[in-house]
Amino acid sequence: MAMVRQFDEETVLDQALNVFWQKGWQATSMADLAEATQVQRGSLYHAFGGKEQLFLLAFDRYERRFLSEAQAALDAPSASLALERFFDVAITNMTSGSPPRGCLTTKTAIESEELSPLIQARLRALLDALEARITEALSRDAVRAGLKLPPAPAAQVIVAFTRGLAVIERVYHEPAQLHALAENFVSLLLGPAAPGA
């Protein structure tokens, strides 16, 4: 007779996500995950396969939520409004939690010397998906007209800038500073359209 799980998988994944986000991939242990989820380590291994598999499933949730929020923010009638809303989402993502958790993608990428190929691929996939969504949003005629750069290069520098913001957040823990930096960055991107944009 098959054993019935005594826990809700969705709840466990949300709790695991919070632990990984708060402590980081490397510092999180299976004991931490068992304590946070109130599920024994053996049951976690049986249900999810191990720390890396649990991280990847939790990261799926993080990715879906973040990309959905970013997409909604980018759906604006002008470049300035789209970028303002996007950076609000990105900064809120970094500064949420108590204490603030930072950006899970950037924390994971920089915290350890070697990441498994699976985790590297997942981080890359999120950044690529984010860049694609930004490019698509900036390609709309009404939005593109306000940019100094063509949409694809603009999206690349926006994604790179968000990684810098994530590092600044870890050092200073000042949301107002992050918003000011984002506002200044947006002002550099806006203006007469680049030739051929």
Where are the regions a protein language model picked out?
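Hydrophobic alpha-helical connector segments
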Residues: 57, 71-101, 151-158
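Short, basic, alpha-helical segments at the C-terminal edge of helix-turn-helix-like DNA-binding modules
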Residues: 60-66
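All-alpha amphipathic helical-bundle segments outside canonical DNA-binding/catalytic cores
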Residues: 77, 81, 121-125, 140-157, ...
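Amphipathic alpha-helical segments used for helix-helix packing
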Residues: 83, 97-121
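Helix-turn-helix
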Residues: 11, 15, 19-53, 57
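Hydrophobic alpha-helical segments that form the core
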Residues: 101, 148-168, 180-188
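Hydrophobic alpha-helical bundle segments that form small-molecule/ligand-binding pockets
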Residues: 115-117, 128-154, 190-197
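Amphipathic C-terminal alpha-helical segment
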Residues: 93-96, 158-176, 188-196
